[in-house]
Amino acid sequence: MLHRTLTAFLLFLFASAVAAQPMVSAADPRAAAAGIEMLKKGGTAADAAIAMMLALGVVEPAHSGLGGGGFLIYRDARSGKLTSYDAREAAPAAADARWFFGADGKPMGIRDAIPGGRSVGVPGELRLMEAIHGDHGRLRWKTLFAPATKLARDGWAITPRFHNFLTRMPATGFFDDWAKAYLYRPDGQAKAVGTVVKNPELAAFYGLIARHGPDYFYVGPAARTLVATVNGAPRNPSRMTLGDLASYKVREPAPVCGAYRGYRICGAAPPASGPTIVLMILKQLERFDMAALGRDSPVAWHLFAESSRLAYADRDAWLADPDYVQVPVEGLLAPDYIARRSALIAPDRTMAAIAPGTPAGAPAFRKAEPQPEHGTSSLTAVDRWGNVAQATVTIESVFGSGRSMNGLFLNNQLTDFNLKPEKNGLLTANRVEGGKRPRSSMSPLLVYDPAGRLRLSIGAAGGSTIIAQVAKALVGVIDWKLSAQDAISFGLLYAPGPGGVAEKDTAVAAMLPALAGLGETLNVAPLGLKANAIEWRDGVAIGAADPRSEGVSMGLDGKAVKPAAASLVKDRPSE
């Protein structure tokens, strides 16, 4: 009897330890290592997330950093409470609907609007770190900066993926002098793969923030530097003020939650459009037997594409900053509205035209053309107590605005607004306004199984493909019973509007003839996808990273687990 009791007790302890197994997944192994270092020191998921964000600002400067912002959802294991953090960049108070109009009185094109100072929003990432550290951190603030500061000071090697971005960017005409010297050789060619680059300016800046706190950035000397940098830009100067920086605050709106086949899915609230639109895609598919169709069915992918088109159309029409416009989230997710939208989808044909619907609570706005999005970094962490942080951070386009200060790049987030404020005589929801935050595709999500157990923490990078990446992965996990790794690795059909893209060299692209028979007109092209996740199966935490990226998952042993590119092969078996 005593033996059986002791055995049961030990099994309980083992199961509890496994369930709370510390782990991270991030877009770069050096960032993952920074997160694991914090977990080894007894830090929380919040501590690990901060260390990873700081490290990504060093080794992924094309995508994120203190010059940007993002969204994070946090699960407190003790209370079960979910907190959604909105650290999206904000427009200066002086901004208005004509912010991106040129000297000719006409709206700029996106390529003309990005470079310089006017596209820069008030950064939110550092205030995000401050908020989650105050709410959930255990380690000292300055401890969180140590790994990233060392990376910046001692140097980091240029990776093939990062080098590819450098070769696609012109060394002159976009970057300022510091950036050109940091990333390019004197002859204007990108520094080679494997070159170790050092960023003493950023190392010093991290040191100052570690000592003086975030106010050094928002009300101290760095605030004056930032304002001078964007207002003094030789191209597209801004009208940002010190007051814009001093007044910036992280919001904590209620998470957006919904159900799909008994699973509860929760994520960041608008202006993050991702969780709402992911839920729409899934809910519109719920009347179809996606499990029976399976991942290798052209009909399943056709249905996914059609549901995506409808949801993206509603995104472009209705999603924006809820502090400035009425955003009908409840109406978009209402069962009667979902039923009406889903009824437009047919398994045997493609819709001739795509238009937004009219959900309950919809204001009088017009759908506008979506703005292109490119950058972002995604990360997730779980600590020994079972707390979970899932974040997506960004400076928007690759290298943001091209403007830099203190060794970091400043965002071009304001070009996520609609550059044209009106369409057909009506204002667009996502137009520029002073203090407003632009719509985002970011989709940090937590998923609970029908028994209420945490099943998945997932996010992605890659602009507007983020929504499709995450929705596809959830169909894979929930309907097709794939592991999170296989669901992320499987190919994507990205269809934000008429037509779409079947990802090159994947099973989805191989279905093109059959999809054409259903009326789909698709291109085939590579997609720069970058999802990551941690899933829980039978009480065991398992990390997942995208084989298309340089991302990894990592446990306390410090070993980076990177999926092989072969995981994209079309005949990979299901689990």
Model-assigned labels for residue ranges:
Residues 266-275, 376-380, 390-402, 459-467:
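Glycine-rich phosphate/pyrophosphate-binding beta-alpha loops
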Residues 287-394, 403, 546:
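Internal maturation/activation junctions in enzymes
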Residues 1-9:
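Bacterial N-terminal signal peptides that target proteins for export
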Residues 58-65, 69-84, 236-241, 387-450, ...:
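Active-site rim segments in enzyme catalytic domains, especially the processed small/beta chain
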Residues 21-33, 37, 43-46, 50-269, ...:
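Noncatalytic scaffold domains of N-terminal-nucleophile
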Residues 252, 373-376, 440-442:
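Short, small/polar residue-rich loop motifs at catalytic or cofactor-binding pockets
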Residues 10, 14-17:
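N-terminal signal peptide c-region/cleavage motif recognized by signal peptidases
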Residues 435-437, 470, 479-526:
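Extended C-terminal subregions enriched in glycine
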